[in-house]
Regions:
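Conserved short loop/turn motifs at secondary-structure junctions
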Residues: 40-45, 71, 144-149
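A glycine-rich helix N-cap at a beta->alpha junction
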Residues: 62-72
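Alpha/beta enzyme core
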Residues: 2, 9-37, 53-63, 76-171
Length: 171
């Protein structure tokens, strides 16, 4: 999947982030360029991000052949907020992530590998619970181990496999 991430704010946002009108103009440009997968936001990053997603949903601006993606951390209240933002958006890609690298595990979270893996599993459980709560069966799940390059390869694989197991896609 070639997914444009030009619309998403977060820690790599522009010094002066785009406002809703600018995001709308950029979204329409990406459609005109032929993108079929577009990351439209990180709803917990700002109210502008949330409002932009709601605008796209309420005005039904997403063509039926386009999949939009949203990003959220594996945290219950943030996943719930993301579901509020995507209400009315068909077939969204929900991209969840959590930090898995050694530095963040030790310094930020003071957590073991097992505890970090559980954050990812709990993220998937929350997505599934929100799917029931919001009456959604069309969510496409994407998971990323944040800061993958600083994560031991065996652990990154272990976490991704645990996510697949919880989602019900074990190979």
């Amino acid at each position: 999947i070639w997914c444009s991430v030009d619309l998403r704010d977060g820690n790599q946002a522009l010094v002066e982030p785009m406002v809703v009108e600018e995001k709308t103009e950029m979204f329409n440009l990406l459609l005109k360029l032929g993108f079929k997968e577009i990351e439209i936001g990180f709803p917990e990053a700002s109210q502008i991000e949330f409002d932009f997603l709601r605008l796209l949903a309420l005005r039904k601006m997403i063509p039926s052949d386009v999949h939009v993606q949203v990003l959220t951390q594996c945290r219950e209240h943030l996943i719930h907020r993301t579901f509020e933002a995507i209400e009315g958006i068909p077939n969204p890609i929900l991209h969840i992530y959590n930090s898995t690298n050694t530095l963040q595990r030790d310094v930020v979270f003071h957590a073991s590998r097992e505890e970090i893996k559980q954050i990812a599993i709990d993220g998937v459980k929350t997505v599934k619970a929100c799917m029931k709560e919001f009456g959604r069966d069309d969510i496409i799940l994407e998971y990323s181990p944040e800061s993958f390059m600083g994560t031991e390869l065996d652990f990154a694989l272990e976490v991704c496999e645990a996510v697949l197991d919880e989602w019900g896609m074990a190979t």
